Amino acid sequence: MSESREQEQALTLAVIMQSVQCIREVARTGDTETSRYEPLIEGLLGEYDGSTDALYGAARLAPGLRRVVEQLEDPQEADTTRYVASIFHLERRLMKRQAVLQRIAEGIEQARSQADYFENPAHTSVIRSVGDLYSQTISEMGPRLMIRGEQQHLENERNAALIRALLLCGIRGASLWRDNGGGRMTLLFRRQAIAGAARDLLEALPTEA
């Protein structure tokens, strides 16, 4: 399908929202659905050709699109707002660090090779590699983003790696948002148009999405 500018922006926000949703679930419960984070990892490892739908699949971003509508029309969750704002902040800082960007590009290429080898982008080894990449790059820029949740879940190595990987997925979404004309003022002045675009995308999906 051919997306409008607002639909592209809605999809990039859905990437961020879905990443945040998964992060919150892992931090609070120790688990999240693979079907929700797998497309985020696939999109992180994939090549962007100008279509967020082609990279992620709008149907697989349905949970994120629903969150876009909820947060833009009637924001209720302060934690979600905080995480999203922090992800945008990290992305802006990252864009000023060419050496870090290069290191991330190299790490993504290595993770892509792993995903191809295991034929599974959500394989534990891939998640661990992407999580380590976040630690070695974004975390080193400081200060670190504080994740709220149950300590027993946050201290679990698998959960910690997945949370870091999802943060990098969210930053990728923020980069795509910027590539599609999104900025600080866009959410202020175009929030209803973007929420409407997210609704249109959801209505166009199969009912089982």
Curated annotation (Swiss-Prot):
<dbReference type="GO" id="GO:0005886">
    <property type="term" value="C:plasma membrane"/>
</dbReference>
<keyword id="KW-0472">Membrane</keyword>
<keyword id="KW-0963">Cytoplasm</keyword>
<dbReference type="InterPro" id="IPR035932">
    <property type="entry name" value="HflD-like_sf"/>
</dbReference>
<dbReference type="Pfam" id="PF04356">
    <property type="entry name" value="DUF489"/>
</dbReference>
<protein>
    <recommendedName>
        <fullName>High frequency lysogenization protein HflD homolog</fullName>
    </recommendedName>
</protein>
<dbReference type="GO" id="GO:0005737">
    <property type="term" value="C:cytoplasm"/>
</dbReference>
<keyword id="KW-0997">Cell inner membrane</keyword>
<comment type="similarity">
    <text>Belongs to the HflD family.</text>
</comment>
<keyword id="KW-1003">Cell membrane</keyword>
<dbReference type="InterPro" id="IPR007451">
    <property type="entry name" value="HflD"/>
</dbReference>
